[in-house]
Amino acid sequence: MAEQLTITAPDDWHVHLRDEEMLERVVAYTARCFRRAIVMPNLRPPVTTVDAARSYRDRILSACPEGVAFTPLMTAYLTDNSDPDDLERGFQEGVYTAAKLYPANATTNSAAGVTDLDQIGRVLSRMEAIGMPLLIHGEVTDADVDVFDREAVFIERHLKSLRTRHPELKVVFEHITTEQAVDYVGSSDRNLAATITPHHLQINRNSMFLGGLRSDFYCLPVVKRERHRLALRRAATSGDPRFFLGTDSAPHPRAGKETSCGCAGIFNAPFALESYAQVFAEEEAMHHLEGFASLHGPAFYGLPANNDTVTLEKVAVDVPELVNGLVPFHAGETLPWRLQPCM
């Protein structure tokens, strides 16, 4: 019998499910193994109101396979003009789980994001007062800052001062990519956590150029030097409850990736848990996978852990070149663990 690991069913604390036809193509892969997911609001137009979030949630549920137990956790897209009252209403009514801060033009569909943190001071104070978490894409967008330094600069220029002004605000530093981010989160005593993606644990910036330009490895924040990847692996597998799973699975049509100006995003949902399992096995930390994938996130958000389980088995699984017409992370590779029941 193959070696097995049974854990509390996991959640994905950062995913892009898109909308319309793309939503129909991808949502089943997230719902396959994650019971809940924090859904990003950067649609066109973005999800900026309670009514828009409620409508989007309904579309997600309609697109889910019949009989699948999956709960989308909705987020509000913050702008310079976000209304604190609308945010509070959505949070109190259980429509919003959190609010998302995109610095304007930092990533896909972020043009309507926040241009200056001073513009949303009232919003952040209200969120702090009601216990509504703030999710941050932590990069500066200044033209004079190297793209590989944008996360580290964001910590120094913005995140430290934001947390000083709002010490009771719960903050998730999303999809961290650097040693500096690991150290900053690890030195914080409360109200700060971070999500880590499978691709930032698996590849470094050399991977984007291995044998040519690998557009399917282009994401934002971009993958970094090897020392940063190793720091992320240490954090993820450490058992530290401040770090938890967030895939940042971000699908794009092949025509949008394989072009002269390709889109940022890696579609990792189909084999996300298998990818994380490979990392934890390589780091001899399988005993910490349940915490990272299933327990730390709910604890930070003040939610109960799921009451069912999933089982991984040490049986090789071949990742296809295409999944529903999209290129998945690990395309053409073999992963050593698979989720039961397999796809």
From Swiss-Prot:
Residues annotated with N6-carboxylysine modification: K100
UniProt GO BP: 'de novo' pyrimidine nucleobase biosynthetic process; 'de novo' UMP biosynthetic process
Active site: D248
Molecular function in Gene Ontology: dihydroorotase activity; zinc ion binding
InterPro entries: Amidohydro-rel (IPR006680), DHOdimr (IPR004721), Dihydroorotase_CS (IPR002195), Metal_Hydrolase (IPR032466)
Comment on bound cofactor: Binds 2 Zn(2+) ions per subunit.
Keyword line: Hydrolase, Metal-binding, Pyrimidine biosynthesis, Zinc
Keyword Zinc applies: yes
Chain positions recorded as substrate binding sites: H16, L17, R18, N42, H137, L220, H252, A264
Reactions this protein catalyses: (S)-dihydroorotate + H2O = N-carbamoyl-L-aspartate + H(+)
Binding site for Zn(2+) 1: H14, H16, K100, D248
GO cellular component, one term: cytosol
EC number: 3.5.2.3
Cofactor(s) needed: Zn(2+)
Keyword Metal-binding (UniProt): yes
Protein family membership: Belongs to the metallo-dependent hydrolases superfamily. DHOase family. Class II DHOase subfamily.
Role this protein plays: Catalyzes the reversible cyclization of carbamoyl aspartate to dihydroorotate.
Protein name as catalogued: Dihydroorotase
